């Protein structure tokens, strides 16, 4: 006769469906904690940036915001969305992603020069140009947090930077050390993967930049859209 409460800001589709048919009771919080306001969100299409000769991972708007926060001595978090990254191939010019014609799942690039569907086994050679727009600017996504850190140091040499990922947090002590250092204003910018996204409260963070925000929509997973929503919201 015990009651169980499933707590989540982003419940799975199965759980939400069960509330709609009466199997579960849906309890909702009417207000955000501490009367917090929703942040202002800017979505930038990097394809448009490319047309204006900006080949950086950072949009011009994000660069302006970072400069502004550094000038004001406020803190910044940069999150690289790499959850489930499996080497899919996309066109930087038009955004087209190579997908399996049978499963509609993104194809994974392999060192032998082929694209493979890990659901049905379909294979095809990696194209030399985009089949949709004809651009030769087509490749597997290959940017990690270390590369982002290098780019930030180059663009913003005045900023103090911490990086938080699997390489820098191999022990519990290092994980807590990075969070403590950022909380104590020993750094201006924290760069990381999904481990920096939820469960932290840094009152002086006034800017969060999500790099490649739509990246995980193209992973070889039929739950890609659901998982992306859970991660970003």
Predicted regions span which residues?
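Inter-lobe coupling/hinge segments of SF2-like helicase ATPases
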Residues: 1-233
């Amino acid at each position: 006769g015990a009651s169980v409460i499933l707590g989540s800001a982003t419940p799975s589709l199965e759980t939400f469906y069960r509330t709609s048919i009466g199997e579960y009771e849906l309890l909702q919080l009417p207000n955000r904690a501490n009367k917090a306001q929703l942040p202002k969100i800017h979505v930038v299409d990097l394809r448009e940036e490319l047309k204006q000769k900006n080949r950086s991972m950072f949009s011009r708007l994000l660069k302006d915001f970072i400069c502004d926060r550094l000038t004001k001595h406020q803190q910044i978090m940069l999150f690289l969305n790499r959850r489930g990254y499996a080497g899919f191939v996309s066109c930087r010019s038009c955004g087209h992603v190579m997908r399996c014609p049978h499963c509609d799942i993104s194809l994974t690039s392999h060192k032998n020069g082929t694209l493979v569907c890990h659901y049905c086994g379909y294979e095809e050679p990696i194209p030399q140009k985009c089949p949709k727009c004809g651009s030769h600017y087509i490749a597997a996504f290959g940017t990690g947090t270390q590369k982002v850190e290098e780019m930030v140091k180059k663009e913003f040499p005045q900023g103090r930077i911490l990086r938080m990922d699997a390489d820098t947090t191999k022990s519990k002590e290092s994980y807590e050390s990075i969070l403590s250092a950022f909380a104590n204003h020993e750094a201006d910018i924290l760069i990381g993967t999904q481990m920096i996204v939820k469960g932290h409260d840094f009152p002086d963070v006034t800017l969060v930049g999500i790099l490649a925000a739509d990246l995980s929509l193209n992973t070889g997973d039929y739950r890609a859209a659901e998982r992306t929503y859970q991660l970003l919201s």
